[in-house]
Amino acid sequence: MAEKTNGAAAPNGAADAPKSSPEQAQDVADVPVTDENGEQIPEDTVLSLTIVLPQNSEKIPIAVSPHEQVHEVRQSIIEMPNALQYSCFHLEHKGERINDFAQISEIKDIADGDEIHLVEDPYTEKEARIHLIRVRELIGAAGDRTDSVQGILPGLSVYDTVAAEARNATEVGEYEFNAGPNVKALLPKENDPQPKTVKAIQVSPWNPPPAHFRQKGHLLYLIITTNEGEQFQITGHVGGFFVNKSSNSKFDPLPRAGPKAYAAHSLLTLIEQLSPAFSKAFAELQEYTNQREPLSTFQITNAIPAAPWLVPSANSAACTHTPDITRTQESFLVSGVENTDTLRDWNEEFQSAKELPKDGVQDRVFRERLISKLFADYNDAAARGAVLVARGEVAPLNPTEGKDAQIFVYNNVFFSFGADGVGTFTSEGGDEAARVATAKDVSGVKLVNQLDIDGLYTPGTVVVDYLGKRIVGQSIVPGIFKQREPGENQIDYGAVDGKDLVATDERFVPQFQKLSKALKVKPHAVWDKEGKRHDLEGSVETKGLVGTDGRKYVLDLYRITPLDVSWQEEVEAESDAPEYPHRMTVLRPELVELFVRQKMREWVSSEVAKRGQAKKDQAAVEEKKEAKAESEEDSDSSSEEESSSDESDSEESSSDEDEEEEKKPKKKSVPKKAAKKEEVKEEKKDEKEASSDRIDVSDFSFTLNPDVFSGQVPQTDAEKEAMAADEKDVRDACEYLRKTAIPDLLNDLRESEISFPMDGQSLSRLLHKRGINLRYLGQIATASDGPRLQCLKEVSVREMIARGFKHVAAKHLRYLPLPLTSSCISHLLNCLLGTAFNAKPTAEIDPSIRSLYDDADLAFENVTPEILRTAIQEEVARRFRYTLASDWYNNLPHLHMLREVCLKLGIQMQHKEFIFTAEGAASQPAPVPVTNGNGNAPAEGSKKNKKKKKAARDTSPDSVTSSSTIPHTFVPDDIINVVPIVKDSSPRSVLAEEALEAGRISILQNQRKIGQELLLESLSLHEQIYGILHPEVARVYHSLAMLYFQLEEKDAAVELARKAVIVAERTIGVDSQETLLDYLNLSLFLYQLGDSKQALEFTKHALNMWKIIYGPDHPDMITTINNAAVMLQQLKEYHESRRWFEEALRICEVVFGRQSVNSATLLFQLAQALALDQEPKAAVVKMKESYNIFLAELGPEDKNTKEAEGWLEQLTTNAVSIAKHAKDVEERRLRAGIRFTPRAGAIGSTSTAANKVAKSEIERPAAASSMDSRSIDELLKFIEGTDKQKKPAAKKRTGRANPKRRGAEPVSTKA
């Protein structure tokens, strides 16, 4: 049984199987670093240097690696507490300036213990602006920001709150398993306001400096108001900052004379001189900041932070909108007066980064880090531009075209709509096909970027979904807008103008060959409209373009895999079903990869089979040769030996010596010549066998033609034959998807081989990993029959409904003006989720806003719950070929569906207790409507509100909620914000992944030291390339935490798991499945370290999140609840532990059934828990049930059955003893004339017996003596008592039958 318990407590998300060899990764870690003389510097060398600061010649020791770059050391310096004030400086070694982009090893005569001097530089205007931004951040003077892309509270983390509660928990409370989800767990506890260091620091209205002062070195002017209330006018000069003579009405930026003539190179130092209270306040601010985990405070720079779907109300401390004049000046501080700092040539940057050398490890690190940062910057810029385009803030380049055909350029990014504005996809499904094609294109670009083929370039590509619009952002390829000469094609390779013309520029062949080989695409023929044949390396839809920069670009990567023809034929054959929206139903690249592997296995099997007979024949021939050779050698040896014995004795002696020779090869009595021949012969035989068994996989080749079933018309018989063969291969791939991929997934889930998904995101990830398209959700839901797959069915149906709602909402939002979108979203949500509270919801629109948009399409007003349900049912039937149950809307889990919808549409809802039913309304106080960002509206009658509204209409539109006469679950004010959903094409780091995989392999091969070095190298590479706050870094922390846990490095595992939790919360989401699993791992590792109390609190938090993400009774909860019960036993909380075991058993019975081995295992553990909780009778009953199930399922000889039998015997013996002792006590009391209600928990001997029995490591034989089942039954009857007159005993049994009821009465939980 111990083995089963350990199995249940295994870390979540086991590491994937490695793919690369340790030799490859050894190359990653072992490329030598050389100094300027070419001499090798050992990799693990660390130089101890001393940084000498300019003020007071203060010295700071610093340890650096020789392969670090100087600008990394610079960054480390400015993050040190003693050097915070420096931002504009250079470093010098022995009087010589050091290049910021050189490696430490390249510094001339650098040696361990050397001093590096920090030398302050003159400021430029840009450096002065950067310095001001940095100082504002450091002293906490920067106010809150309104960010259109990242939303409200981006990169939220609740770890600090959870950890504080875990540390401060004094006693283990009774956990409410039946309680509903608590959305408060999604938000951190409100902190005290941070200490204020200055009242204000802002750019002066005297900016920019006039020409004659600019000539004197003036860069910008500032105003600082200290905490003492004094205001100072500051000049930013090339030499630093000083107090000037200006006032708010008089301009004199020259230095002030007299006692207040303060000046300093750093603004931070200057403020310290100006304000006596600053130093103390700044120290308090740093102390305040240090109370939180550093990872939860760092700014996220290399990824778009996760935006929470539930945010505090506008009146909360976390979202208070404070006045900050500099917030309006930030665009100037960031990009300057001319706004030239932020304009970047994205395409040139991408392609130049791709062309960087990648020979050595440091070259690859630098290249991949630059590419990662570049993609992060581009994705952010493209998302911001897309939001502006969607809101109508950017003028189109072709305003006379239809809305969907308009194109835009903003911030050097080219934008277009993901719709069929020019009729390109008319035959494929119009707008729907165009929408799918853009998503497939960005995935294709990501795949090509990952392959990193030399000489083949892609534009930076991003797809943004925002308020129903899909917008594509691409870096501008040089020459893409160029007007071509007559007869010259716009495209150099692939289809031109649909598929009427096909271009075949030979310059693209080498690169497209590499691409097609990697993507398993078959070189094939296509035909233009005139029937002319063209041989292409890739799909006709994949285009090649030679830019004016001479680079070869690949475009339109939405058809890199073949069509799912089985799906198309199936939906076309359904006469009564609605038509599928488009014909862009391509197979996933993951499926093609899996199918090719399957084909490879089949090929290897056939090769083995082919060689089988030949091998047998060859073996027979060799046996004959060996027999002949042996006979010759025997005759030779017999003639050479001299012996006086007869011939038969000689033969016996010879054979005996041969046998000894096999055991002892150095026996001298055997002829050396014969032994040598035998050895050579065996070696040759082994070599032959090895060479014959080895199959060269490079001989295998299997590719698919992506253009079959897409209108290609072969001309000759040979071409038709080739096309038919290609079509068969594609049909086989489609068959593999339906007959193998989907059934394998269902089987793995049914057998608990993999974790069940919890929500739509995890379901999508799981299906895509298995190569299954989401259009098969309907089939998966239909096939998920039985209690074991009920969870999968629920998640699949929820996902289909949420996606159906998303498409319906997108149609209404697409052309709606921004101020009306909150009314639209809230009304549609009321129709979906609020009908149990208000069966006839009405849309709430501010009349003043309505009057401003006379031409707006307000069709959402007419949507009723019935219309919305019908529309969702149609979408689900159309897209997933699934028919929802007739009353599906009555069974929706309200909060979970709200979360799914918000995540899909990017909605940020106001945090409140949502009222979904009339019963819920009775227990909730009436909500107070918000009229503006900082105040509450008085609760008045609706008529009065309407009059007020009419009077105030011309000045400021009031809150819509105040005019509401009938309450709704959602009101427009609940929709706080909408953030864009971004799909990017950023590649992952190949270098970091190689090191991680090789580390795993080394550990599997028991090369622990090398493995750990490689794991550390991988961690370092991930952090260097991505930055610390990135989803990929969260995942590597997760993987490494588990690997270190398996290596018994428990402290390191806990630290990595803690980092994984925080980084995942901030970059993936507070309530994502990945974050939840990270919390469970952290909990498990803490338990193994002996901190059961804190481990239990993290488990409870994970369960609370589970309720929000999925709800109760998720199959994977069984393991988690079981683990928590074990933790409670460790804390000697026996009664609470028993409640957790009972809950685990309840879910197990729902999922696996009562008569299952899983239930028997939990019954076994529950029986032990009952014994510890002083319930001997119940313990015997549960152990007997466990024994009977094991006996029926596994047989009498199984170790689990024997162990249960042994426990049953001992528990029964102890229970009989306790029952007998209780009867004796009762009889003595009766004789004395006193009668008490007996309680097992009150008898002293019970506690001792229970503790004695329930030790998990009990010292006794594993296989107990067999017991007569009838005697056990008799003993049970004796324990339970047959005397009907003992009413108190009967009452006690009733109470024990439902242990959950015992929560109301005091229960002894003594050790």
Swiss-Prot record:
Any single Gene Ontology cellular-component annotation: cytoplasm
Listed GO MF terms: mRNA binding
Protein species of origin: Pyricularia oryzae (strain 70-15 / ATCC MYA-4617 / FGSC 8958)
Biased composition (Basic residues): 665-675, 1287-1301
Subcellular location: Cytoplasm
InterPro entries: CLU-central, CLU_dom, CLU_N, CLU_prot, GSKIP_dom_sf, TPR-like_helical_dom_sf, TPR_rpt
Record region (Disordered): 1-27, 606-694, 925-966, 1276-1311
Family: Belongs to the CLU family.
Biased segments, Low complexity type: 1-18
Protein name: Clustered mitochondria protein homolog
SMART domains: TPR
GO BP terms, alphabetized: intracellular distribution of mitochondria; mitochondrion organization
TPR repeats: 491-525, 1034-1067, 1076-1109, 1118-1151
Principal cellular location given in the protein's record: cytoplasm
Biased composition, class Acidic residues, residue ranges: 631-661
Composition-biased stretches (Basic and acidic residues): 606-630, 676-694, 1276-1286
PROSITE patterns: CLU, TPR, TPR_REGION
Ranges of residues in domain Clu: 324-568
Gene: CLU1
Keywords on record: Cytoplasm, Repeat, TPR repeat
Subunit structure: May associate with the eukaryotic translation initiation factor 3 (eIF-3) complex.
Biological function: mRNA-binding protein involved in proper cytoplasmic distribution of mitochondria.
PANTHER family in alphabetical order: CLUSTERED MITOCHONDRIA PROTEIN HOMOLOG, EUKARYOTIC TRANSLATION INITIATION FACTOR 3 SUBUNIT EIF-3
